[in-house]
Amino acid sequence: MPEQGASWAVFMEDPLSLEQCAGRLERRGFRSFVVPGLKEAAEVMLGLVREFSPSSASYGDSMTLKAAGILDDLRSNPDIQFYDGFVPGMEREEKWEIRRRGMTADLFLTGVNAVSMEGTLHWVDMVGNRVAPVAFGPRHVILLAGSNKLVATPAEARERIRRIAPLNARRHEGFRTPCMHTGILSLIHI
């Protein structure tokens, strides 16, 4: 886990399940927030950014983070060096270099493929630029998950990833993975 622990902003519909999941995440060392929607999740995340006062920030690609608008807030903050390795049209080598720098930023934000009711987080990461910073690097990590990410068990998390990861991979130019064509992630040890 990152030095200061991770913060978790989550929004979903079923408050009972959410509170249970949040409690299990907290037992694993996460600060957890249950909020009713994306707007409120963005407000919590902005509050955490103010609390952390990072001099640098980066992110792992996440449609939910983009929808929340938090990335635009970080980009426009003159006090934060924002490492954005996802700029369209940027040369591949430059993207890699910026993503490497982002892994040691003061703040890293990302989504997650699935969260089990047991309080476990599940990812499949094509290049590792989301998982690596969550495990080590930034002083602070904020994870954001929508209701679509909550599953009952780790086995259900793996099944969700098998179905969803190929759809997500299709969004990225220049990547050619087998699952993009078959529609099913087929890793042996997932």
Residue positions per predicted region:
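Long, charge-patterned amphipathic alpha-helical coiled-coil/hairpin "stalk" segments used as oligomerization
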Residues: 95-176
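Conserved small/polar residues in nucleotide/adenosyl-binding loops
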Residues: 188-190
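Alpha-helix boundary/capping detector
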Residues: 51, 75, 145, 183-184
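Iron-sulfur (Fe-S) cluster-binding modules
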Residues: 1-28, 52, 170-177
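Short, functional N-terminal and low-complexity linear motifs
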Residues: 7-13, 38, 123-126
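Flexible, glycine/proline-enriched loop segments at strand-loop-helix junctions
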Residues: 8-9, 31, 86-88, 141-148
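N-terminal active-site beta-alpha-beta segment that forms phosphate/nucleotide-binding
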Residues: 14-99, 104-109
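Phosphate/pyrophosphate-binding loop motifs in nucleotide- or prenyl diphosphate-using proteins
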Residues: 176-184
